[in-house]
């Protein structure tokens, strides 16, 4: 299985202060081919015709406080790849995060 793991701020490192941010990523790497993307994700154009089987937005993605990162990602809803959101920190911008998950 090929997984695109989208996260933010290098939180998947085993040396990160809060290691649980990267626990899922580190376990997935043992079982699948995982492509890590860290940073803002604006368009699904690059993955439309790729061999990605699943897209996961990790815990670190949902620590961001910039509302722009929770906007609709261009073309992602048109791609027939399952998208998983690891919703995190619901006390901050919960409605924006829920809408992000619905739209994408």
Q: Where would I find each of the regions flagged by the language model?
A:
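Extended catalytic core of nucleotide-activated donor transferases of GT-like folds
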Residues: 4-104
């Amino acid at each position: 299985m090929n997984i695109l793991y989208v996260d933010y701020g290098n939180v998947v490192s085993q040396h990160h202060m809060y290691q649980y941010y990267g626990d899922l990523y580190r376990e997935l790497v043992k079982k699948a081919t995982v492509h890590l993307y860290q940073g803002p994700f604006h368009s699904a154009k690059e993955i439309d015709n790729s061999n990605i089987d699943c897209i996961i937005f990790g815990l670190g993605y949902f620590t961001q406080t910039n509302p722009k990162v929770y906007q609709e990602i261009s073309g992602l809803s048109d791609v027939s790849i399952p998208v998983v959101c690891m919703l995190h920190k619901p006390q901050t911008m919960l409605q924006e995060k829920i809408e992000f998950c619905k739209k994408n």
